[in-house]
UniProtKB/Swiss-Prot annotation:
InterPro entries: Heat_shock_Hsp33, Heat_shock_Hsp33_C, Heat_shock_Hsp33_N. Under oxidizing conditions two disulfide bonds are formed involving the reactive cysteines. Under reducing conditions zinc is bound to the reactive cysteines and the protein is inactive. It comes from Streptococcus pyogenes serotype M2 (strain MGAS10270). The gene is hslO. The lineage of its organism: Bacteria, Bacillati, Bacillota, Bacilli, Lactobacillales. This is 33 kDa chaperonin. One of its GO terms (cellular component) is cytoplasm. Gene3D superfamilies: Hsp33 domain, HSP33 redox switch-like.
Amino acid sequence: MDKIIKSIAQSGAFRAYVLDSTETVALAQEKHNTLSSSTVALGRTLIANQILAANQKGDSKITVKVIGDSSFGHIISVADTKGHVKGYIQNTGVDIKKTATGEVLVGPFMGNGHFVTIIDYGTGNPYTSTTPLITGEIGEDFAYYLTESEQTPSAIGLNVLLDENDKVKVAGGFMVQVLPGASEEEIARYEKRLQEMPAISYLLASKNHVDALLEAIYGDEPYKRLSEEPLSFQCDCSRERFEAALMTLPKADLQAMIDEDKGAEIVCQFCGTKYQFNESDLEAIINDKA
């Protein structure tokens, strides 16, 4: 089961989140039938949103949009504070040549664009923030968002590793943040450790990458695990929700579906689930609108 572990240095100088998101990204790949580069780009976006959602309180919903002018198209993810995330990528078929080590490149092909976040607190006034894509690698773009929009300097690492058949082998990441009150000496020590950390791909390839991430982040410094919470890919779509959407259409449009298509098929963008509405279903909706 996927999980996020929240921790804090015993000194109180900084905190860290580490994630195992393997099942989340594997299920997203399965549902959307994504090829290698699309899988990694979508996976990184899902992991970034899992981190962002874990930083919120209450019943907030968080939307992350990675909008570039590349062949990937838009990448959209929605998460809640209960560990659930869903998402899709417009172009599922991007399969760009890998590096000599087999790693999938994303940044050089993302193009210009923006990292957009929408945090809905349920009050009717969602908070929206837009920052430019800095590298297109998504992790660095997420870190830039945290620094610019939330005024919280953060170190972010996230990635998706694929096997020889381009299926998800492992996915995960981390976030490290300096906390208020940290001394200059503690900040310098933290920055030095991050600079010396192995690459995220190397750490994810470890037998237990969650422990490997924690060890790389804290080194010999004592720390406390604050919580361990489950994560999952979960879509909240339903037949009832799409039926309500059909109710908003003009009667003429619904009648055209009956006359021309003998019904309607609606496919959820986020999970690919198909919902069928036959002629009788559509006629009932028309009658309900009367």
